[in-house]
Amino acid sequence: GNSVKVKWFNEPTNLHTIWDSKMIDSQNLSYTEYANFILTGIDEVVLDKWKRDDVLTYSYESRDYRNQCYDYEGDNLSYNYIFKNKSLLEKRLLQGGLRLAGTLNRIFK
């Protein structure tokens, strides 16, 4: 994504930055508020499974989602891109946080 040059609401950037910060910042919530929102209604069984997943599982999932991330027309991304990818963004943020927590818990147990 770093080498994929695009615009975000007419501002030059790259696709990696859009996923790392621009879509998150566009929610206009604090990080705590956004984390609480993402956690709302998630099944505990799913959360526990994600905590136990290994790095290989995560990398395969990322590969499978790659086409969705690159599915856009033109080079000026905005509201439509958010609409198409917000649920995936939130899922990956949640999975990343849980998997990091699970890994750290296993290391320091």
Feature locations, PLM:
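An amphipathic alpha-helical core segment
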Residues: 5-91
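Divalent metal-coordination and catalytic microenvironments
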Residues: 100
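Sec-exported extracytoplasmic/periplasmic mature domains
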Residues: 24, 105-109
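Active-site beta-strand/loop microenvironment that shapes enzyme catalytic pockets
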Residues: 1-3
